[in-house]
Curated annotation (Swiss-Prot):
Pfam families: Glyco_transf_41, TPR_1, TPR_11, TPR_12, TPR_8. This is UDP-N-acetylglucosamine--peptide N-acetylglucosaminyltransferase 110 kDa subunit. Its EC number is 2.4.1.255. Belongs to the glycosyltransferase 41 family. O-GlcNAc transferase subfamily. Residues 991-1010 are annotated as: Required for phosphatidylinositol 3,4,5-triphosphate binding. UDP binds at Q849, K852, A906, P907, K908, H911, V912, R913, R914, H930, T931, T932, D935. Glycans are attached at S3, S4, S399. Ubiquitinated by the SCF(FBXO31) complex, leading to its proteasomal degradation. Phosphorylation on Ser-3 or Ser-4 by GSK3-beta positively regulates its activity. Phosphorylation at Thr-454 by AMPK promotes nuclear localization. A motif (Nuclear localization signal) lies at residues 487-503. Keywords: Acetylation, Biological rhythms, Chromatin regulator, Cytoplasm, Glycoprotein, Glycosyltransferase, Lipid-binding, Nucleus, Phosphoprotein, Repeat, TPR repeat, Transferase, Ubl conjugation.
Length: 1046
């Protein structure tokens, strides 16, 4: 605030006394300017006693008393000056200063304005008026006051800088910038303007320009404390920590007891990972300023990082005692409560932080994250959007919102969020990892691998990224450093389990790695506990369950829960089961977790179940569970486990008295809320029951089932063309299938019936033989027409009124037949030439996804191919990017590239049908073909397997045991190779085994859905009777076998 000291008026006394008076006046002025107010007052009083009416002396006395905060005395002398000269603008201005200091702003403003009316070019008056208007909240008026001052003197660089400050405060950054630049133009060495300009650039996000201007300010004024602090702050934000430390240390050399600078310096130490130094520096800041909530909050952050959570919690609470509305402390304390599992308190604190500070982006994001974990996705999304609205460059919020959108199945939205997060912060490892997960789920594996590698480069200790990268590399069969990778992955899981953290390996992937059974079970258990955490916040009381069947008219109500009622392998397996239950004893409910996909698979289940409920329309797990409970379900069946689309929270709420795992997930749930796992003796031997959290409930033959007889009845029979006419009949070179096959064959001349002998499916497979009749079409004009259709790539021809179609063209003829939704109505021709398979070689095949192959499996297959020289291995491009890796590893093992033939993934019907062309299927021991095993067996192709220790590695053995083909089950690697080699070199033996599989698929229980349903019903009744008797779940490993006529 400018005080006007005035000029000493001319004296009428003689010259000698006048000189003495003038000299004393100048001395008083100099003392005033130097801040020696005591001496200035003493000399002024001498002057006043000599000339009591001298307005210059009166103004100087007014200013001296004002500086000494003797406001009444200051006002007194200003008033005396006005009495002497009512037009003295400076006196009114000085009086205005007194009023302003007393808080009487309107009186101050009136006096300043009066001074300016008296003296329109009074610069100090404008400056004082501007300050008073700012204090009164009239910012625009203050701007005009500064502008008026500058109109009278454009070279007032200090005033122009002050105007810039005001414009900056109003958010008018470009105008502020212009002011500072003009001030610098007027006075290039004006350090304050350089510093202020740096603040503008910082506010505009021009970090490097800000740094440059702050550095210029401290160069011009090496003792400019605020500029050093500003420089340190912007360097801290730019993460240039060493230079930030230097700036703060220089500031402390100028002001050693500056608590805020100590606090900021501690923040830099914290970011540098110098936690102990940060803690010490925060403590120094608190020592200097005990009522410093920011320092307590930041100290708590450092203590938490060090693991001193209890002490950190105390510090947050201290900060809140000092300032109950300290939003950062509320937010950070909420984070601790969340990590402690006290979710309700965390939510309360986040909401309190937002109540205090609605524009708190981090609190919005954190609250959203908790809401997402609770399954409240829409509310979470709302808070993420708020966080981003408040802070458009909040990369974490974008990344986390992407996670929510991903969970809501909005893949494009999630992709955009992750991409934006990375644009904002290219070094954001979590966002790269999240982006990778979207690519992975979308099947863009190379992009996923690249993003995971970027994440790990940015953050080497990143278990989630490492384990997901390992899975991606498994998918494409990239086995570089395979053994080392497996060791590291196991050690990551061990460390996470020891620290009670959620493992980075997903339960569904755990079967692929050399983990112990205990680890696999613990991984599943952690995921089960997550479901419990989500439902705990609902505060739902336990459901009461019936102990009898009175309310259901004596019928057992079974509820099947799945996200896969549609075009999905699970429906391909079980779609007929709901409609085959005995309606007198069972009432069937199917609960869909996914919307209608418009396929016949969905239509069939909807039509044949007694009740079909689309729970995808009830996103709230509590309400969905209520619906299940209201339906009075006795046995609730989980067909998802931890596969995509699961809602295990429904089971965690226990809406049914008995809950069982079945079919859709190849492992234990690890969850206390699942009572049984429906399995069989071969898949889950009783001696490994400890692998499962559930009790084992055995089916008498196999827990696996396939609806192939219903979906693909046209493959029950086949005919072949004797294309070589050399007396050797091949059953899998040119194959014809069709519902009308017999009628078509009857219309042809010269069709021969060849009897193929095959062993029975008893315990002793070689004890007796039965004959199978296989129609053979000789090479004639009709056969030639069929072969010409294939060679020319024609879609379809007509022979004797029958439509004969090219097996590669099913999607063009009838797409629903291609997907397995309808039975093809044409005669379909399938040939080895369609897939580039050699006519005169043994074809081994495997139609699994490539992730099921590991180095030891490929080595076994290479050994087999070497021992069977005239043989090839037929695999799928599943995915295509895995093909070059497999080929390269095979070449390293001594196999030429032409020994492995890849085909694209095919529609379901073609996929099953073309399996007839292979001679032998080689199963993957790591994780068997489950649905694909059923597919290849329905095609009549023998499958060699070697059961391991996991459920996923024993399913094929269970299928083969049910089929009666024990000779195809190996006990070890050598036996696996020997069985495959015998099939490839002993063609008579191969023919017998192929005949056996062809026969047994019809006569064994493996594809008998009616018998399977009856056995499943018997198991359900066992479970119910056990429960109704008041017993806890127990193993049911003595299944009651039933026959179809039972």
């Amino acid at each position: 605030m400018a005080s006007s000291v005035g000029n000493v008026a001319d004296s009428t006394e003689p010259t000698k006394r006048m000189l003495s008076f003038q000299g004393l006046a100048e001395l008083a002025h100099r003392e005033y300017q130097a801040g020696d107010f005591e001496a200035a007052e003493r000399h002024c009083m001498q002057l006043w006693r000599q000339e009591p009416d001298n307005t210059g002396v009166l103004l100087l006395l007014s200013s001296i008393h004002f500086q000494c905060r003797r406001l009444d005395r200051s006002a007194h002398f200003s008033t005396l000056a006005i009495k002497q000269n009512p037009l003295l603008a400076e006196a009114y201005s000085n009086l205005g200063n007194v009023y302003k200091e007393r808080g009487q702003l309107q009186e101050a403003i009136e006096h300043y304005r009066h001074a300016l009316r008296l003296k329109p070019d009074f610069i100090d008056g404008y400056i004082n008026l501007a300050a008073a208007l700012v204090a009164a909240g009239d910012m625009e008026g203050a701007v005009q006051a500064y502008v008026s001052a500058l109109q009278y003197n454009p070279d007032l660089y200090c005033v122009r800088s002050d105007l810039g400050n005001l414009l900056k405060a109003l958010g008018r950054l470009e105008e502020a910038k212009a002011c500072y630049l003009k001030a610098i133009e007027t006075q290039p060495n004006f350090a304050v303007a350089w510093s202020n300009l740096g603040c503008v650039f910082n506010a505009q996000g021009e970090i490097w320009l800000a740094i440059h201007h702050f550095e210029k300010a401290v160069t011009l004024d090496p003792n400019f404390l605020d500029a050093y602090i500003n420089l340190g702050n912007v360097l801290k934000e730019a993460r240039i920590f060493d230079r930030a430390v230097a700036a703060y240390l220089r500031a402390l050399s100028l002001s050693p007891n500056h608590a805020v600078v100590h606090g900021n310096l501690a923040c830099v130490y914290y970011e540098q990972g110098l936690i102990d130094l940060a803690i010490d520096t925060y403590r120094r800041a608190i020592e200097l300023q005990p009522h410093f909530p920011d320092a307590y909050c930041n100290l708590a952050n450092a203590l938490k990082e060090k693991g001193s959570v209890a002490e950190a919690e105390d510090c947050y609470n201290t900060a809140l005692r000092l300032c109950p509305t300290h939003a950062d402390s509320l937010n950070n304390l909420a984070n601790i409560k969340r990590e402690q599992g006290n979710i309700e308190e965390a939510v309360r604190l986040y909401r309190k932080a937002l109540e205090v500070f609605p524009e708190f982006a981090a609190a919005h994001s954190n609250l959203a994250s908790v809401l997402q974990q609770q399954g409240k996705l829409q509310e979470a999304l709302m808070h993420y959007k708020e966080a981003i609205r408040i802070s458009p460059t909040f990369a974490d919020a974008y990344s986390n919102m992407g996670n929510t959108l991903k969970e809501m199945q909005d893949v494009q939205g999630a992709l955009q969020c992750y991409t934006r997060a990375i644009q904002i912060n290219p070094a954001f490892a979590d966002a790269h990892s999240n982006l990778a997960s979207i690519h992975k789920d979308s099947g863009n594996i190379p992009e996923a691998i690249a993003s995971y590698r970027t994440a790990l480069k940015l953050k080497p200790d990143f278990p989630d990224a490492y384990c997901n990268l390992a899975h991606c590399l498994q998918i494409v069969c990239d086995w570089t450093d395979y053994d080392e990778r497996m060791k590291k992955l196991v050690s990551i899981v061990a460390d996470q389990l020891e620290k009670n953290r959620l493992p980075s390996v997903h339960p569904h992937h755990s079967m692929l790695y050399p983990l112990s059974h205990g680890f696999r079970k613990a991984i599943a258990e952690r995921h089960g506990n997550l479901c419990l955490d989500k439902i705990n916040v609902l505060h739902k009381p336990p459901y009461e369950h019936p102990k009898d069947l009175k309310l259901s008219d004596g019928r057992l109500r079974v509820g099947y829960v799945s996200s896969d009622f549609g075009n999905h392998p699970t429906s391909h397996l079980m779609q007929s089961i709901p409609g085959m239950h005995n309606p007198d004893k069972f009432e069937v409910f199917c609960y869909a977790l996914s919307p209608d996909d418009g396929t016949n698979f969905r239509v069939k289940v909807m039509a044949e179940a007694n009740h079909f409920i689309d729970l995808s329309q009830i996103p709230c797990n509590g309400k969905a569970a209520d619906r299940i409970h209201q339906d009075g379900i006795h046995i609730l069946v989980n067909m998802n486990g931890y596969t995509k689309g699961a809602r295990n929270e429904l089971f965690a709420l226990r809406p049914a008295p008995i809950q069982a795992m079945w079919l859709g997930y190849p492992g234990t749930s690890g969850a206390l809320f699942m009572d049984y796992i429906i399995t069989d003796q071969e898949t889950s031997p009783a001696e490994v029951a400890e692998q499962y959290s559930e009790k084992l409930a055995y089916m008498p033959h196999t827990f696996f089932i396939g609806d192939h007889a219903n979906m693909f009845p046209h493959l029950k029979k086949k005919a072949v063309i004797d294309f070589k006419s050399n007396g050797h009949i091949y059953d899998n070179r040119i194959v014809l299938n069709g519902i009308d096959l017999k009628a078509f064959l009857d219309s042809l001349p010269d069709v021969k019936i060849v009897k193929m002998k095959c062993p029975d499916g008893g315990d002793n497979a070689d004890s007796s033989n039965t004959a199978l009749n296989m129609p053979v079409i000789p090479m004639n004009t009709i056969a030639e027409a069929v072969i010409e259709m294939i060679n020319r790539g024609q879609i379809q021809i007509t022979i004797n009124g029958f439509s004969i179609s090219n097996g590669l063209a099913t999607t063009q003829i009838n797409n629903k037949a291609a997907t397995g939704e309808e039975v093809p109505r044409t005669i379909i021709v399938t040939t080895r030439s369609q897939y580039g398979l050699p006519e005169d070689a043994i074809v081994y095949c495997n139609f699994n996804q490539l992730y099921k192959i590991d180095p030891s499996t490929l080595q076994m297959w290479a050994n087999i191919l070497k021992r069977v020289p005239n043989s090839v291995l037929w695999l799928l491009r599943f995915p295509a990017v895995g093909e070059p890796n497999i080929q390269q590893y095979a070449q390293n093992m001594g196999l030429p590239q032409n020994r492995i033939i890849f085909s694209p993934v095919a529609p379901k019907e073609e996929h099953v049908r073309r399996g007839q062309l292979a001679d032998v299927c080689l199963d993957t021991p790591l994780c068997n073909g489950h649905t694909t095993g059923m597919d290849v067996l329905w095609a009549g192709t023998p499958m060699v397997t070697m059961p391991g220790e996991t459920l996923a590695s024993r399913v094929a053995a269970s299928q083969l045991t049910c089929l009666g083909c024990l000779e195809l089950i190996a006990k070890n690697r050598q036996e696996y190779e020997d069985i495959a080699v015998k099939l490839g070199t002993d063609l008579e033996y191969l023919k017998k085994i192929r005949g056996k599989v062809w026969k047994q698929r019809i006569s064994s229980p493996l594809f008998n859905t009616k018998q399977y349903t009856m056995e499943l019903e018997r198991l359900y009744l066992q479970m119910w009777e056990h429960y109704a008797a008041g017993n806890k779940p127990d193993h049911m490993i003595k299944p009651v076998e039933v026959t179809e006529s039972a």
